[in-house]
Amino acid sequence: MRILHTADWHIGQTLNGWSREAEHRAFLADLGEILLAEQVDALLVAGDVFDGLNPSGEAQRLLYAALAGYVRANPRLQIVLTSGNHDPAQRLEAPEAVLRELGVHVLGTLSRGPGGMDLDRHLIPLRDRAGQIRAQVLALPFLRQADLPGLRLGAEEGTEGAVTAALRALLAETVARAAAIAGTLPLIAMAHLTCAGGLESAGAERRILIGGDHAVPPDVFPPALAHVALGHLHRPQSLDGGRVRYSGAPFPLSASEIGYDHGVTLLDLAGGAAPRHIPLPRPVPMLRLPAQGTAPLPEILAALDRLALPDRPRAEGPFLYLALRADRPVTEITAALDAALEALPLRLAGLTITRPETARPAAAPPQDLTRTTPEALFAAAFRDLHGTEPETRHLSAFRDALSEV
């Protein structure tokens, strides 16, 4: 029994207005080749399939065309797809009746029955190519406050926060019931959350737990679970001795992820081997200048000149993040960058300009607002931020905005 675990596709993402559709098409094609080459029996997608709560029609077509293609290539392939915090949970489930006929299980929301979580829906048997059940997967969507019975925000259970305690209780009860059904078969869980000890991507992953808890310890997942396939953290990594695994995102979703070894995770139940990371090719380069820290404008311009860039349209070119240290007025920096980038097949994904602390004037004592004007305050703030006086167009725009207040 061979299971492939992936997560955090973020279909529909844009960077500074640039579409990433071509990258998602390339990844989904690569994934299809891996499914066939590795003779995968089941594909687990642990949340954040889409990048936003209102995915475009094209983003949805891209997803469903890929799923249909995988099943067409291997009619016995089983696919289990759960929601993440970015996903529109109910919209994800809308075509469930059709997808179920293709062997695709979609869990966007938590379903309950009289005895707790509805295991007829959330516990899914995984079959090998001979049709024999070889494992059971407990598929958990992204959990919200209402999904945690007994949650009392602000309360603490011993040394644990309220959310951790409520999640631990939910998993203990549910996994015990699921394990009784699984018997001697391996029991696998899917979830979308942050585990303590996991390495996060700066600025890329929202802190999604409630009630003040940011992360839960890996031991909230009971020992009866042979493997836990997680989504949310974009760096591929293992916790709890390898039992708890983040597959990571398929390619960089922000500048902080440029150095990651993106890929998918293969779990071979028959061989009993540790989960295996399968690297994915990077569809489009993502660059950061400088690689670390910041640099002044002349160094950035020189680095741009040294880049060996592919001969392709800008809309297909590498993504670029720039981190500058201001050595002149910001308006001069942006004008110089605009001129330099105009001739290069690069897509500017992000720009930060910081001023050295030594260049910042000492904080002035608070002004008596009865002795100044809004325009004078605007001009002072503009000087502090840009190192130069506001131009007439800046003052005109400020006056227009002020007149609307």
UniProtKB/Swiss-Prot annotation:
UniProt record similarity statement: Belongs to the SbcD family.
Protein's recorded name: Nuclease SbcCD subunit D
Gene Ontology molecular function, alphabetical: 3'-5' exonuclease activity; endonuclease activity
Physiological role: SbcCD cleaves DNA hairpin structures. These structures can inhibit DNA replication and are intermediates in certain DNA recombination reactions. The complex acts as a 3'->5' double strand exonuclease that can open hairpins. It also has a 5' single-strand endonuclease activity.
Keyword annotations: Exonuclease, Hydrolase, Nuclease
SUPFAM superfamilies assigned to the protein according to its UniProt record, in alphabetical order: Metallo-dependent phosphatases
GO biological processes: DNA metabolic process
Record's keyword annotation contains Electron transport: no
Pfam families to which the protein is assigned, alphabetical: Metallophos, SbcD_C
PANTHER family (UniProt xref): COMPONENT OF ATP-DEPENDENT DSDNA EXONUCLEASE, NUCLEASE SBCCD SUBUNIT D
Assembly description: Heterodimer of SbcC and SbcD.
Taxonomic placement: Bacteria, Pseudomonadati, Pseudomonadota, Alphaproteobacteria, Rhodobacterales
Keyword Hydrolase: yes
